[in-house]
Amino acid sequence: MGCCGCSGGCGSSCGGCDSSCGSCGSGCRGCGPSCCAPVYCCKPVCCCVPACSCSSCGKRGCGSCGGSKGGCGSCGCSQCSCCKPCCCSSGCGSSCCQCSCCKPYCSQCSCCKPCCSSSGRGSSCCQSSCCKPCCSSSGCGSSCCQSSCCKPCCSQSRCCVPVCYQCKI
């Protein structure tokens, strides 16, 4: 009885062997025409569906680039750091997903837009806790909100309505 090779893809028809085939080698895994070395391959045949890697995922994430069959565990892509949202809790979207992006602040991440662009603060203040007007409850108008507003925001009389307060964040 002959043995089934893996050329042409993976699946139930791509694996298995009888007693005359010997043991499986270290190269007996993966998908595609070259996935079996030697050609006598024992089950299970590990396949990524679709085939994926850190480089093939890129900025897309792992949503459509994962899964496996044959009981072989997870595919490589799901284990890559570039397949994880980098700014999910900082005010930036998951579309900012690439390996160089997993840093605490969005301002350090080249693909993230500043999350506090309309709050009067600079991009260096880009995290979820600071995406609020800095003088909203201090008695000062929003026009008095500047990047330096962690200091008293009513130091100038034109900012005070009706009296001077300190910024409360």
From Swiss-Prot:
<feature type="repeat" description="8">
    <location>
        <begin position="159"/>
        <end position="162"/>
    </location>
</feature>
<comment type="function">
    <text>In the hair cortex, hair keratin intermediate filaments are embedded in an interfilamentous matrix, consisting of hair keratin-associated protein (KRTAP), which are essential for the formation of a rigid and resistant hair shaft through their extensive disulfide bond cross-linking with abundant cysteine residues of hair keratins. The matrix proteins include the high-sulfur and high-glycine-tyrosine keratins.</text>
</comment>
<feature type="repeat" description="6">
    <location>
        <begin position="130"/>
        <end position="134"/>
    </location>
</feature>
<dbReference type="GO" id="GO:0005829">
    <property type="term" value="C:cytosol"/>
</dbReference>
<comment type="similarity">
    <text>Belongs to the KRTAP type 5 family.</text>
</comment>
<feature type="repeat" description="4">
    <location>
        <begin position="82"/>
        <end position="85"/>
    </location>
</feature>
<feature type="repeat" description="3">
    <location>
        <begin position="47"/>
        <end position="50"/>
    </location>
</feature>
<keyword id="KW-0416">Keratin</keyword>
<feature type="region of interest" description="8 X 4 AA repeats of C-C-X-P">
    <location>
        <begin position="35"/>
        <end position="162"/>
    </location>
</feature>
<protein>
    <recommendedName>
        <fullName>Keratin-associated protein 5-9</fullName>
    </recommendedName>
</protein>
<feature type="repeat" description="5">
    <location>
        <begin position="101"/>
        <end position="104"/>
    </location>
</feature>
<dbReference type="GO" id="GO:0008544">
    <property type="term" value="P:epidermis development"/>
</dbReference>
<comment type="subunit">
    <text>Interacts with hair keratins.</text>
</comment>
<feature type="repeat" description="1">
    <location>
        <begin position="35"/>
        <end position="38"/>
    </location>
</feature>
<dbReference type="GO" id="GO:0005882">
    <property type="term" value="C:intermediate filament"/>
</dbReference>
<feature type="repeat" description="7">
    <location>
        <begin position="149"/>
        <end position="152"/>
    </location>
</feature>
<feature type="repeat" description="2">
    <location>
        <begin position="41"/>
        <end position="44"/>
    </location>
</feature>
<dbReference type="GO" id="GO:0042802">
    <property type="term" value="F:identical protein binding"/>
</dbReference>
<keyword id="KW-0677">Repeat</keyword>
